[in-house]
């Protein structure tokens, strides 16, 4: 399996290397995504498509317990390794599973996150419905992506090399509305102008964004975080 095709579902030694690299390279984006999430001490959190497990580790600093799920066994193994101590403390659990059939009861989680992973979800509208099933009433679903749509050169190249779909904020909002999510808020980061664009309740506002970004962030002009409630 080639380096690009392996990104969808990391396998073997190459997958392990890629996952460790993503833990590092995606950090600026992930920390920006997490700025828009209010994790409380009693929250039970699920990270879908947990990859290398670093975001599980970050959220476990605030939450009561964090679960991770991924359909890549290599991701599950590395996530367990990264969070070994927290697993031993009972604060983290990592499982193999698929977003279309999550191995949890209805109304289980206060927060569900998806960092850099919805690109690979089959039947995304159905997947959003499955996320909603295991989310508690009033719970929050948060997605983090490095690009708002594919109308930029880096994402156009990525789509050709990797089997992935890059969605715009309007498309994702539409899928959420089709599943009756509420209080949908879109946060877009305009790195060029150092502004954050916030879309909510039919209104758009811009605020100054002084987020201290690494050079990695400048590959994409518009990071995106979307939050929605059940």
Where are these regions (language model features)?
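Short, glycine-/aromatic-enriched active-site segment of Class I SAM-dependent methyltransferases
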Residues: 146-163
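Class I SAM-dependent methyltransferase SAM/SAH-binding core
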Residues: 46-101
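A short acidic, Gly/Pro-enriched loop at the edge of an enzyme's catalytic core
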Residues: 100-111
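A short SAM/SAH-binding and catalytic strip from SAM-dependent methyltransferases
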Residues: 111-124
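Short alpha-helix
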Residues: 164-180
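A short glycine-rich, Lys/Arg-flanked "PGG" loop and its adjoining helix->strand segment in the class I
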Residues: 125-137
């Amino acid at each position: 399996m080639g380096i690009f095709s392996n990104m969808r579902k990391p396998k073997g030694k190459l997958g392990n290397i890629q996952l460790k690299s993503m833990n590092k390279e995606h950090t600026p984006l992930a920390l920006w995504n997490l700025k828009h999430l209010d994790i409380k001490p009693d929250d039970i959190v699920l990270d879908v498509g947990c990859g290398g497990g670093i975001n599980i580790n970050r959220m476990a600093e605030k939450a009561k317990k964090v679960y991770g799920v991924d359909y890549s066994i290599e991701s599950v193994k590395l996530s367990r390794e990264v969070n070994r101590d927290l697993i031993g403390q009972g604060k983290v659990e990592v499982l193999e599973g698929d977003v279309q059939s999550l191995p949890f009861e209805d109304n289980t989680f206060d927060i569900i996150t998806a960092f850099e992973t919805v690109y690979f979800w089959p039947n995304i509208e159905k997947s959003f419905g499955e996320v909603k099933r295991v989310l508690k009433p009033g719970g929050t679903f948060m997605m983090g992506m490095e690009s708002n749509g594919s109308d930029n050169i880096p994402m156009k190249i990525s789509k050709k090399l990797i089997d992935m779909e890059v969605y715009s904020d309007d498309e994702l909002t539409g899928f959420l509305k089709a599943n009756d999510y509420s209080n949908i808020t879109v946060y877009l980061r305009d790195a060029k102008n150092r502004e954050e664009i916030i879309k909510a309740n039919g209104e758009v506002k811009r605020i100054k964004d002084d987020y201290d970004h690494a050079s990695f962030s400048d590959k994409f002009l518009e990071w995106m975080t979307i939050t929605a409630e059940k």
